[in-house]
Amino acid sequence: MTLLEMIQKENAAAFTHGGKFHADDVFSAALLLHFNPKLTIQRGNRVPEEFDGIVFDIGRGEYDHHQKDSRIRENGAPYAAFGLLWEALGTEILSPKMAECFDEKFVQPLDNNDNTGEKNELAGLIGMFNPVWDDNRRSDAAFFEAVTIAGRILEHKWERFRADERMEQQLSLIHISEPTRLQ
């Protein structure tokens, strides 16, 4: 079964780490929910043995980058969970060319932040959704609040990339190449 089929099946479920969250797991969850808003996402410190679903950013599986042999892109940028999921699903949302461009301009900076601590303003803003020490909110509630915002950001960003592609197509009709990107 492909990842997309797993996401879209009835009663689909996903699991990620609990506690403090980062842009990586938040955008990963938002990406999965794009394909199935009814997907149930559970958080915890350990993947339950009986769990039958998509596991990301924990568990040392296909969509977890916390392992010795974690993958690195050809340009040297390390994958985090969001990048691994985007690699599998990006062309379901954008054309191959635009999916690659989106990876380079949007996903890789978030993956770099998660892997190296490199400063990233968006990652910092998402991190601010984590409850402070004296906040009575549960971490899970804050996580899903951040996921909702991340989902809206993704939708708007994808539309910008689609608009760029439409612009390139229109400009190619009048033989202008390489327009200035507005991203």
Task: Kindly give the residue locations of the regions a language model identified.
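Short, flexible coil/linker elements and helix-boundary hinge sites characteristic
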Residues: H34-N36, E155-E159, I174
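Generic structural signal of hydrophobic/aromatic residues within well-ordered alpha-helices
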Residues: F106, L110, A150, Q170-L171
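Long, charge-rich alpha-helical interaction segments
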Residues: D140-E145, I149, I153, K157
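Charge-rich, low-complexity N-terminal segments
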Residues: F161-E165
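Single conserved hydrophobic/aromatic residue that forms the stacking wall/gate
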Residues: I174-Q183
